[in-house]
Each structure stands twice: as structure tokens, then as C-alpha cells.
Amino acid sequence: MGLWRRMALVVVSVVATPLVLGGCTTERKAPVRLAEREAPAPEPEPEPELTLTPADRSRDVPVSAEVTARVTGGKVVVVRIADDKGMLVRAERREDGSAWVPTVALRPRSTYTVEAIAVGDAGRTTTRTTTFTTMPTSTKPQVTSTLYFADGRTYGTAMPVTIGFDPPIARAARADVQRRLFVTTDPPQPGVWSWLDDGSQVYHRAPDFWRPGTTISVRAALEGLPIGENLVGDADRTATSRIGRQVALEVDNATKQMRVLRDGKVIRKIPVSLGKPSTPTSSGKMVIMEKHQRTTFDTRGEPNGGYVVNVADAQRLTWGGEFIHGAPWSVSDQGHRNVSHGCTNVSPADADWLMKVTQVGDLVTFTGTEVRLQAGNGWTAWNTSWEQFVKGSALPVPAGPRPTPPATPRPGAVAGGSPTPGPAASTS
């Protein structure tokens, strides 16, 4: 057999074999299959790229530091933070996934190790570690923060989460501070932080009133937080409380009457005497801030003051000293004329009844008086429209949450309707 004959037989044998294995077919696909079988193996998928901060060997890291794990071509599945003794540090991931926030401030002058694991789109994993050291306790002046939301309480449906700052927070530093303020609700309800113009207070509220029975947990994680160039935060503050029944008070100067509403229904009307023209009561939407069975009003240190009086069943509405309280000396005026220094006078019996019905966090609305409530004179989060409130956030606010129109357009309506916009000008 010649050389060309032998070569022809070999080629036929190779080509014919797939035809036999393929079964009864007339299609000649063997050359294609041969080419596929001889193609080079695909390149292995690259590992996901994983970057951690604080960067490895970082020093003088603030005790408020958060851990970020950024990945390209995959997703982060594990982040562990451990102290220098190997004890794990609990951390919670931000809702937007941008960082892991330790649930307590880190210790000063301490070393921490972060381990993160990411899985690539093709299933490959990569692990990265970083070690950093926190700064010593700062010697910079502290901003004193006050959380006006106590632990283990029951509040009214209009209760805003309020934090005060001394000194006030400069506009340029507000975004950094706001990122360290956390509110969670059960059941979930959207909410937004909004700053007073002067930076002395920040409020958190929902578009509508809180639902009765809601549990609200708050954390102001400010300990060691750099605030601007020359200040630091003072402490981490936390609290968890619940929202009680829906109660609202409406006071009309024209009629000298207070309407008390529970779940949107009037349950009592009370005659009142408000501030006389020289010391008028403010019009606007306020929130009950404090309740005292007995207290003393002493205005001798004020320019237009000069009296001391003991009062019973007093409920604070403003920082400037407007209260609802029992006033036996003005019972004959209540429902007819205004004689007070700015407070809302009611009879001792009505004051006692109100103390049993109201909660800190209940909404109180005044209409028809000579002056308007000043922003920040009390917890004035409801004394503006939702659209204006959102503009006070130092961070972008996702579009979406808006107030639900109430069935009855009045501030005492059941949660599900925000009060109509109120004034926010100056008061005396």
C-alpha cells in the first residue's frame, strides 16, 4: 500500500468515527466537532478586586471609624472586625451597603484587624485583611449632644426624635454628623432628618404621624467623631421606646376653647385663657415636651418678668416657657378672655384630667393668636410642611415618602395624615 493510500485511510478513519457515534444522521458535522475539541481552554475568571478602609497600617484613626469593603466583579459576603485580643467587634451594615458601623465606639489607642471575603461573579472568592490603630483620646473641645428621646418610654404619635448641640453644628459639618444618626422603626416607616438653620437642633420625623404601637430605636453615634477642624463628638447615645395612642389638642383663640381628640374624635372641650396682648401665646404646631405634677415658675431674672408662682399639672410646650397648666386664679376668665403671661390656663379639674390623657409627644395646635411660633422654640418639627422639612436634611433624601392626605384635614386626624403647614416666624 502506497504512502498516499495509507494517509487517506487515516483521515477517513478520524472523520468517520464521530458519524458512527452520532447515530443515524446524514449531516456531516464531524469537522466542526473536531475543531471544537481542539480549541484552547478558556481563560480562568479573574478574582474579584477587594479594597478595604481603613487602609492597612493606618494610624490615628478616629474611634468613630467605619469599615468599607469595595469590590469590583463580585459581592462582599463576610466582614469581620476583631480587636487586639481577637475578640470580634459587632458591626452593622448600612442600609445602602456602603460601610459597616461598629455598634459601639472603638477604644482609643487600640489595634483592630478587619477581614473581608468577596465572591466573584463566576464564584471565585478572595480574602483581604487590614490592620489599623485608633488615635489617642482627643484633646479637642467636645460638642455636647442631648438626645431628647429617653429609653423605655411611651410617647405620642407626633414625637420627633430631637438632638440638641452645644455649640451648634456648622453647616459644613452637618452631613458628617447626620451620617452618624440612626433611627429604626418596627414596623418600618420612612423618616428624614432636618436641621434648624442655626444648627442647634436636628429633628427626625416621618411624613405622617408615627403609627400607634411602633417601636423606635435611636442611636446618635457621635463619640470621637471629628466635627469640622476643631471639635469632636462627645458620646454615643441610644434609646428605644414605643408610640402610644393617638391624642391631639387643638386650641382656638377665637373661641377660647381647647378640643381634645383621641384617634381623631373629640372627647372633651375645655375653656382656656391664653396670653394677654402684651404677652401673647404663640400660634403654631407644638409638641408636649415635659409633664410636671407640680413646678414653680420664676421669672424674676427676665427683663419683663418679676413673678413667682407655684403651679400644678404643668405641660411644657416651648423652651421659652409656654405651658398648659392648672390656673385656679383665672377660672372666671377661661373661655372668655386672655389674662396669662403666655401659658394656656385651664381649670384645676381639667388640668388634672389632661395629665391623665396626654403623653409627651402629643401634638398641640394653636390658632388665631397675635404671634407665630419661632422655629426651634420647642420641638417644632411639625410646624412646617413636609416639603420644607425635607429641605433641611444635610444629606440627599430619596424621592418617595410623602404624607398621606388625611380624611379630615385637621391636625387631630388619625396617623396617616400630616398636619397642614404651620407658621414658623418669630415670637416674643
Where are these regions (language model features)?
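Gly/Pro-biased beta-strand-loop elements
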Residues: 227-332
